[in-house]
């Protein structure tokens, strides 16, 4: 079973004191203010054989997301909707404590949060993925790979997922005596997306709340809370991690800060996606 770096990366006490002393001055190891996000870089169509893909770099954190579409049957309880299946893998090359094998509880948690943010925000219109109502629909496989764990991997996973979905090509569907089949030689459009969604994570270290914690900061944090937002700043997901607690005042302050950061992050995401 893999362990997250925030649980395993041991920071010497003297270094923790150094980091916190910087917080007292309103700055951080990398020169950021407490409310600053790390530089974001998105490379679209990175995996050429996927139907859509995006490589996201958030500081030293690197995440690759790719999509594959296939014709499938709808779920019984949603006969008039397509399917979205999200998987996240923490690759062994991303951090020394990550192990080969099936996804562990940390990867499963990441996948669930990303999935919930996409569904609850209705970023992807699943009703427009129907080929024949009740019989045939598109299933969107969204696979997310953490390539380098430099902290705040959840935000990076959400960004990579959204970018890959916007990059996804939809191919022509043809029907013959055997049913429906995909004609990979003809692209008919893109996935029916309504809007992007972003996640903003804020860590608490002692009495300080910091945006987009890096690996060292996660290693000394008491707890962390993540908020997912639509462009109209509707909250569509909240996730807490870490063993510590937050007061209601901390949560209110964290959400107010996250909301302001989300505005800038959504603008940057739209700019890099060209939407």
Curated annotation (Swiss-Prot):
It is found in: Cytoplasm. Its main location: cytoplasm. Pfam families: RNase_PH (PF01138), RNase_PH_C (PF03725). Keywords: Cytoplasm, Exosome. GO terms for biological process: rRNA catabolic process. It comes from the Archaea. One of its GO terms (molecular function) is mRNA 3'-UTR AU-rich region binding. InterPro entries: ExoRNase_PH_dom1 (IPR001247), ExoRNase_PH_dom2 (IPR015847), ExoRNase_PH_dom2_sf (IPR036345), Exosome_comp_Rrp42_subfam (IPR050590), PNPase/RNase_PH_dom_sf (IPR027408), Ribosomal_Su5_D2-typ_SF (IPR020568), Rrp42_archaea (IPR020869). GO terms for cellular component: cytoplasmic exosome (RNase complex). SUPFAM superfamilies: Ribonuclease PH domain 2-like, Ribosomal protein S5 domain 2-like. HAMAP family: Exosome_Rrp42. Non-catalytic component of the exosome, which is a complex involved in RNA degradation. Contributes to the structuring of the Rrp41 active site. Belongs to the RNase PH family. Rrp42 subfamily. Component of the archaeal exosome complex. Forms a hexameric ring-like arrangement composed of 3 Rrp41-Rrp42 heterodimers. The hexameric ring associates with a trimer of Rrp4 and/or Csl4 subunits. This is Exosome complex component Rrp42.
